[in-house]
């Protein structure tokens, strides 16, 4: 995958794979609600920069994560899936169980970061584009 458009196509292919397998619910385990404004031109430039092995700024990374989340939720809405946002997730915080079972095996916890503003921004944009999932 070389371009932003390739990335979007890969996301769509994975979504279709899970839909074909009978999936009707998605769960996004995210550290925070990503909802920074961005343009498609910015995303193409950010993706190109990262693919060239150059470091992206924190602001660029946030724009990319915001677009990734938005596109995933848009696909969920299009497929009439139910979406769970597992936000403020602190992953793999039990070292003994991580060593025994590996990553993402259920030993996570929820943090106490503020999310209201970003959640409202994300849901409003999804609603305006008729892409708010269940």
For the regions a language model picked out, list residue spans one by one.
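Histidine/acidic residue-rich metal-binding segments in metalloenzymes
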Residues: 1-133
């Amino acid at each position: 995958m070389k371009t932003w458009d390739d990335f979007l196509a890969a996301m769509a292919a994975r979504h279709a794979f899970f839909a074909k397998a009978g999936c009707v619910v998605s769960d996004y385990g995210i550290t925070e609600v990503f909802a920074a404004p961005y343009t498609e031109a910015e995303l193409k430039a950010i993706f190109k920069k990262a693919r060239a092995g150059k470091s992206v700024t924190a602001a660029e990374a946030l724009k990319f994560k915001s677009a990734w989340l938005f596109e995933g939720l848009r696909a969920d809405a299009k497929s009439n899936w139910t979406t769970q946002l597992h936000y403020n997730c602190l992953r793999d915080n039990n070292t003994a169980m991580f060593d025994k079972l590996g990553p993402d095996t259920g030993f996570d916890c929820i943090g106490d970061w503020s999310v209201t503003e970003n959640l409202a921004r994300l849901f409003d944009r999804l609603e305006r584009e008729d892409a708010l999932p269940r």
